């Protein structure tokens, strides 16, 4: 394996949508960071069989709806 070409691999904490926390090794963030999941196997419709809900991350969905609200579609 070549030296100094791979990202740092360290421990992070992952928090699922139901509040469950676990630690895993990852290249995301830095040592000790917390990754809060928006969607996980406990809440994703593909695994739960439930209704699909739209997650408006960053206001993109709201911006789209506002832009095209006058079309009446």
UniProtKB/Swiss-Prot annotation:
Keyword rRNA-binding: yes
Signal peptide: none
An example Gene Ontology biological process: translation
GO molecular function: rRNA binding; structural constituent of ribosome
Entry-linked PROSITE patterns: RIBOSOMAL_L31
GO cellular component, as recorded: ribonucleoprotein complex; ribosome
SUPFAM superfamilies: L28p-like
Keywords: Ribonucleoprotein, Ribosomal protein, RNA-binding, rRNA-binding
InterPro entries: Ribosomal_bL28/bL31-like_sf (IPR034704), Ribosomal_bL31 (IPR002150), Ribosomal_bL31_A (IPR027491), Ribosomal_bL31_sf (IPR042105)
HAMAP family given in the database record: Ribosomal_bL31_1 (MF_00501)
Family of this protein: Belongs to the bacterial ribosomal protein bL31 family. Type A subfamily.
Subunit structure: Part of the 50S ribosomal subunit.
Chain's role: Binds the 23S rRNA.
Protein name: Large ribosomal subunit protein bL31
Origin species: Chelativorans sp. (strain BNC1)
